[in-house]
Design a protein with these regions (language model features):
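Active-site hotspot residues in diverse enzymes, especially metal/ion-binding acidic/histidine motifs
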Residues: 1-166
Length: 166
């Protein structure tokens, strides 16, 4: 693993879009009083605060992942939450500003930001900032942990190549 962080966080998303998504994430974490990992995404979907969106049980998957994909459903639930927020006039009126329309890339970025908040990952001890450790601590796939580390300009394994569509 390369021990030197990148000079700048990397993302293909425009800075304004990233900033809006980060403000949205911080507002959600504050409203749900979530202060440590793992983010309770299933509870957030099932229990919308102040009626900001409608919880549709038919849209929420209760399938458990397994093996290397055991945390993939959490990312899917976070992406669903973004879509529900973006479709909700009440959420917009309540100050939860979701950029819309956005690319699939932006929705994936939201999911990673929500499940792996920047402040939390930066607060980890350096030995806990490995893809495998981040995966376990935040309950996300190792793949998404790698992408998030790269987005934040944190040390990455030297042999990791991140697809350009992320």
């Amino acid at each position: 693993m390369d021990s030197t962080p990148n000079a700048e966080p990397t993302s293909a998303l425009p800075p304004k879009t990233r900033a809006r998504i980060n403000r949205l994430v911080n507002a959600l974490l504050e409203r749900y009083q979530v202060t440590e990992p793992p983010v309770p995404i299933e509870r957030m979907l099932k229990q919308p605060l102040d009626g900001l969106w409608e919880a549709h049980p038919s849209q929420i998957s209760f399938i458990m992942g397994h093996g290397i994909y055991r945390y993939a459903p959490r990312l899917a639930e976070a992406r669903l939450l973004y879509r529900m927020l973006s479709d909700s006039p009440t959420a917009r009126e309540g100050g939860l500003d979701t950029p819309w329309p956005v690319s699939r890339r932006a929705i994936k970025y939201f999911a990673r930001c929500l499940l792996i908040p920047e402040e939390w990952i930066r607060a980890l001890r350096p030995p806990d900032r490995t893809p495998d450790a981040v995966s376990e601590i935040f309950q996300v796939t190792t793949y998404d942990a790698i992408i998030r580390l790269a987005e934040l300009g944190l040390p990455m394994p030297a042999d990791v190549v991140i697809p350009s569509d992320e």
